Structures are given as C-alpha cells and as structure tokens.
Amino acid sequence: MRKLNVSNLACYRSGNKIFSDISFNLNEGDVCLLSGSNGSGKTTLLRVLAGLIPISYGSIEYNNMNTLEDNFYILGHRLGIKEEVTPYEDLLFWSSIYNYKNFENVLKRVGLKNYKSLKCKYLSQGQKQRLAISRLLVSKKSIWLLDEPLSSLDKEGISLLKELIDEHNKFGGIAVISSHNDFLKKYDFHINMDK
C-alpha cells in the first residue's frame, strides 16, 4: 500500500519562517487539502514536497523512502506552455517523456480535441489550464501536487477536475491540493496554513 508520511516539516528562507510543524499521513486514495491566505506557505509546502525547495527540518517519506523521487507530478502557477506549439504538439512531447500512448484521448477528455491544431497562444487561460491538467493524466504519477488548480477554470472545468481527482484517488492515487475555493466537498486531511 502506498503511503505518504510527512513529519514535523519546516521551511525557513533567509532566516524567516515560512511554515513549521506540518505533519500528516496519507494512504493511497487520500486527498489532503491545503487552505490559507495568500503568503501562508501553501505553494512553498507543495514545492518542498516536490523537492524543489530544501527541507529545513522534518521528514518526508513515501513508501519508506526519504523522497517522493519520480512518483509525483506538480501542477503549479506557471504552466510552462509554449505559445507557438499546438495542444497536440504539447501533449505529444509530454507523452513521449512519460511513454503514454493514447494522448489524443486525453485531449478529448479535457475538452481540447477541437482545439488540438490551434497554436496555444490563441487558447483562453481556462483552455491552457485544461492543457496543463492533461499532463497530469499522461504522467501516470501516483502523487498529484496541485497548486490552486482551479485557476481560470469555468464551472465545467472545475467539475472535470473534481472528476479526474476522484478517479485518481479511486485507483490508489494521492493528491495534495492547495485551494481558496471549497470545491472539494470530501477530503481526508485538511491543513489550514494560517494556524
């Protein structure tokens, strides 16, 4: 059984405390919701979990290893979408990295099938967010780290994202999600970064 154990995690930057004493244990199928005001450390916590920012104190273990290694995908604020490529080309690139074969079905699933040949610079922000979300699916990673994933999504896009998270968890995936919006009616662990 997959397990993510975070114990007494702390992060200091330039001597300033960003957060401290963060602990939680997630099993396969679990969702952890991070809430809090802007600047409370939600993004930093996700980046620490991903290994992009060093841990000041504490530990992160996934399946008894001291790292998430190659088991996670982080969806952050910067989507990294190249304006001159098409959604088809973008997902073809990511699919080749993750050895995912049926990426055209993923474009259809996220509602971008009819836009697959349009350069990304002509997509709306919501469509770009859907393209970024499609990378989660082709990554096949067991842990999703989602930083404000509702950004620019309309009601239909939010509903799609909830459905994808539910499916991910149903098949044993773990999700750690920061959000100002209470779009998740059900979660297994909640961390209020303001406390």
Residue ranges and their predicted role:
Residues 133, 172:
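Hydrophobic anchor residue at the start of the ABC signature
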Residues 78, 83-102:
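Q-loop/switch helix immediately C-terminal to the Walker
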Residues 55-70:
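Conserved ABC transporter NBD signature motif
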Residues 144-148:
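Catalytic Walker B motif of ABC-type/P-loop ATPase nucleotide-binding domains
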